[in-house]
Regions:
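Hydrophobic-composition signal
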Residues: 35-36
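Structured surface interface patches that mediate subunit assembly and partner/cofactor docking
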Residues: 2-24, 39-60, 67-79, 96-272
Length: 272
């Protein structure tokens, strides 16, 4: 509707709301400045969202691990992993965050920052060639799936990390989480992260850690027969969004058909 005061919008109660005036940029430079401002706003929003997701996933993960009975740590949990192994594997989300941020600092030598034997190894840059730039969480997960997915190595790293958690994995995980959350809080979203498959910024890497904590938090809850904590349930929506971004080609159709009840997913279908 329009009136004497210019264009108006109608709100949900049928009341007219005056539209804000829109000034068109005068030239191409103004358009470019506007685009830069928009890009910066989008980046800030993405950074805030990734931090919120990581905080929720971490809180839920710590809670579910802390509730696990110690006498069940040797029970089967996921594939070849015991419950301890699974907790150890998932806790590496914190270790990789620390180590890859450390490796991304200027003039920083690659490798674990504190000598931990269970720390991931970050690669020495190839002479004369910088590691590739990864522009999104999806790009990292796809690259990691191709280059870091040796099942035996993944299994063994999980077991080593699980043993390193000691007699009280709940307390050990809580300490790792507190350290990582504090690190994230004092680090800019555009800080460089150097992973084995490429370089990226923290705001793009953080969702991959939140995804690990979310999915494996659910695995742990299932293994011990407990309802996932509320914080983990909050983390489900961004995890599903990231799963959707990982789909490509016919997989998009396959998943949509399954989600709308037309057919079941193929046997052992997985995005990761």
């Amino acid at each position: 509707m329009t009136g004497s005061g210019g264009p108006t919008l109608t709100d949900g109660h049928g009341q007219e709301v005056a539209a804000a005036p829109c000034a068109l940029p005068a030239d191409g430079a103004d358009w470019a400045e506007g685009a830069d401002a928009t890009d910066a706003a989008v980046a800030r929003s993405a950074d805030r969202q990734s931090r919120r997701w990581f905080a929720a996933a971490s809180a839920g993960f710590v809670e579910i691990v802390g509730s696990c009975p110690r006498d069940r740590l040797t029970d089967p949990a996921l594939g070849e992993w015991t419950l301890r192994d699974l907790i150890g594997h998932a806790s590496r989300a914190y270790l990789t965050l620390e180590d890859y941020l450390e490796a991304g600092r200027p003039a920083c030598a690659a490798g674990p920052s504190d000598g931990r034997q269970d720390s991931p190894r970050t690669p020495e840059p190839t002479a004369g060639r910088r590691p590739p730039r990864l522009g999104s969480p999806t790009a990292y997960l796809l690259a990691a799936r191709s280059g870091l997915a040796d099942p035996t190595a993944v299994r063994d790293r999980g077991r080593v990390a699980g043993e390193a958690l000691g007699d009280n994995p709940g307390q050990a995980v809580a300490r790792l989480a507190a350290r990582a959350v504090a690190l994230v809080a004092r680090t800019s979203g555009d800080a460089e992260v150097l992973t084995p498959v490429g370089r990226m910024v923290l705001s793009d890497y953080l969702p991959t850690r939140a995804f690990e904590l979310t999915v494996h938090g659910l695995d742990i809850a299932r293994a011990v027969g407990r309802r996932p904590p509320a914080a983990l349930r909050v983390a489900l929506r961004p995890a599903l969004h990231l799963c959707a971004d990982l789909l490509s080609g016919d997989d998009r159709m396959t998943v949509l058909v399954a989600l709308t009840g037309r057919a079941a997913l193929p046997h052992r279908f997985s995005l990761v």
